[in-house]
Amino acid sequence: RSLIAAALLTPLVLRSPCRRVTAPVIGGAVCYAAFNYCFIISTKLTTSANAIMLQYTAPIYVALLSWVFLRERIRRSDLLCMAFVFGGMVLFFLDETGGGTPIGNLIAVFNGVTFAGISIFLRLQKDGNPVMSMYLGNLLSALIGLPIILSAGLPDGASLFFLLLAGGLSALTYALYARASTGLTALETVLLPIIDPVMNTVWVFLTLGERPGALSLLGAAVVLSAVTARVLSAIQP
């Protein structure tokens, strides 16, 4: 998937007038690769709910680091949004938390740190080409996973189709994410994607008919409302 994503991101990198490989570019790439593998490993060693919940502790680290490295002040609306988002996430995963191993939970916490690192390093490139970090990060992820790919053998037709689909979606989403980071604060770049696990419940319900519980619905409503209110407050003149 990462190799396909890197191939699709290549034209964006080549067409950009800014192709310098700076320290923030390398930092973003390393954090992105670490983020990919930490998430995969954490879902194997702890519950999926724990892995996702601990991953989205990233706003805490961003709130601390963005002032130090970016001099971006945390506004009251940011703090309110964070409080409601965390409350909603707790409700969302309340029935699913528990279990897993301490090392799995620890890796999931570190995954939140790497997610925060991506946000900080992309924001440091606001006057450059943050897509370069995503490009190099995908290349690094592919390089790390190359021994596993070679030992697994060639994929069948169905697996190849899903690999192409996943690679294409990954390239599209992270290209957009990198571009959006140039016009958002570091905290906003980690708060807005929290909609992702919430919407997963909606897609699973629509496609597979798996009905979410009352707490999940309440948590989803809280998260969506908090993020929407934060976005609307940011665009008001």
Where would I find each of the regions flagged by the language model?
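Helix-helix packing/entry segments at the starts of transmembrane helices
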Residues: 51-57, 122-140, 170-206
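Specific transmembrane alpha-helical segments of multi-pass solute transporters/efflux pumps
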Residues: 14-50, 55, 91, 164-184
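Hydrophobic/aromatic residues within transmembrane alpha-helices
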Residues: 42, 47, 68-70, 125, ...
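Specific alpha-helical transmembrane segments that line the substrate/conduction pathway
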Residues: 2-4, 40-71, 111, 186-205
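Loop-to-transmembrane alpha-helix entry segments
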Residues: 19-23, 52-55, 71-91, 98-105, ...
